[in-house]
Amino acid sequence: MPPNNPRVRIQGTVRYESYGFEEIEGKLVKKVREHVYDRILARDVVRIIFFLPHDHHHLITGVAHALDSYLRAIDGHPGALSEYTCCWWESFKLTETGWDRIRETLEPKKPRFFEDYEPHDARFAEKDGADPYFTLFGEQGNGYSFKYHARLPWREPPPPSVSVLSATLPTEHLEEHGVQHVRELAMTMASRLPFATGHAGLALDLWHPIYDQLDRLRTEIFRHPGFDVRKASHFDGMGTRVDGIHWMNFLGPPVLSELGGAAGLRARLHSPATSVQELEGERTVITLGDAPEAGDTTQGQTLPAYRELARLLEPHLEPFPWGYLARKSPEVEEELRRWWRRFLD
């Protein structure tokens, strides 16, 4: 049985403006409309994510397998996925047409490298489908999602450039189906993905970035260090860096070889809660405990296995990602930096 982790559901109001034109006395007049609605701004989920230093045409088979594995895992939950985006920011209701579009992105195509675009066309490479992406999600706040975004293909890719695949499950899914079900899903998704790094573990799915919601979430994230709030994407240029410490930590080349492989990890990790499992293709997964844990610092539950792995991986961890806040919000930057090092200090 999974541990009794806390529920986190933060409700709030979202405001945004849309623009259009209205004909008044024969003239088109620009109109600004304000939209206001309530939604869940933060909720607890299990997040699975992989950082893939490869172009789309090398990933198609693995991404299709990961998607099919996810769909099988959530079978029996009608409405879990009800909307989608595909190679465009606007979302649509998920119909057979939507599935056709997503499957089309996973059909092999002749790669076109970014260098092959004429200068006047290069800025439209994303719209041309050079970096295919799609997202599947359910009604707001239900915790189900699947997302894939390929990197732009270069003949010599910039080192930080990666494609990213991620999925989330509500924690209720973990409780209903059990830890083994979620563990097997993460392992099955990983099995055909040539990842550099990746993880599976507890996270807070945020509508707004953490620095805009710190007042709402401060108590939760400092009390429960097992909740991740860093939602890295392909825009962040993760390269081969490790994005924090989680329940299941997937490592591939070059980080794994620099740590001495699975044998080197076993020799340096001594927590009884830690297991190191070798995978095909010079990869491994480090699992911290039988189930994901949020921890509770008020009860002395500081997650020592997480802290031990953090010390080992510190040279390979992603640098603090919110340093730009130092000028406009130094207090927020300082607090988030303290959270970022919660397993190191």
Roles of regions detected by a PLM:
Residues 2-88, 208-345:
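C-terminal interaction module
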Residues 88-215:
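Internal, hydrophobic cores of structured domains that mediate oligomerization or house catalytic pockets
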